[in-house]
Amino acid sequence: MLSFNPRLQPATLIKRYKRFLADIVTPAGEVLTIHCANTGAMTGCATPGDAVWYSTSDNPKRKYPHSWELTQTQIGDWICVNTLRANELASLAIDNNQIVELSGYTSVKREIKYGDENSRIDLLLQAENRSNCYIEVKSVTLLQQQCGYFPDAVTLRGQKHLRELQSMVANGHRAVLFFAVLHTGIRQVAAARHIDNRYAELLAQAQQAGVEVICYGFQLSPDGIALDARLPLLLDETPNS
């Protein structure tokens, strides 16, 4: 479990703007401008009036010491909007052998240069007498009809990562796309063809070439985030009712 220490503080969202900033109001009535690490569209994750939870850094050099971590929607779903947490959560779960599909490796390296397109892999797993395992981690927060979609905006970077993973398989390695589902309302995951058709096409190609796609949900609270159950990946765009 990833624990928030000190515990996150509550507030109410006023608005998100300039991608990286949000204004909130605390229970005491103080208006704060906080940092938002999520560069995506954040559809359904940033509705004015939602309850938000933020952390505070003790780094005196930070212009905005507070960071937006969680949202609780007005229907009760929890969302981790800090996309930087996805890599941390995946790495922690692998270190603790909680993801059976990714267990048995003796070395976990992070942010290693690889591929032909000047990329960095999120996680590289290695073990003696086993192929290298290249893992790209993506955060899923877009919810529509209990289905989580990725991406929530056109992502040329994400398209590049799929090409790189496919290349790793062609070179004899293992390659995994790990979807960290950080919205408690999501029950299944699909490629957002209606948002980024090229990404959906590349994902299908990558799977056919041998890239594995693994989706896991997480339990979210102001105390921390813990790995939950594996979730199904839909091969088409029709959510289960």
UniProtKB/Swiss-Prot annotation:
Residue stretches spanning the membrane: none
Annotated CDD domains: SfsA-like_bacterial
Superkingdom to which the source organism belongs: Bacteria
Alphabetized Pfam families for the sequence: SfsA (PF03749), SfsA_N (PF17746)
Example GO molecular function: DNA binding
Family per similarity comment: Belongs to the SfsA family.
PANTHER family in the cross-refs: SUGAR FERMENTATION STIMULATION PROTEIN A
Name this protein carries in UniProt: Sugar fermentation stimulation protein homolog
Taxonomic lineage: Bacteria, Pseudomonadati, Pseudomonadota, Gammaproteobacteria, Enterobacterales
Gene: sfsA
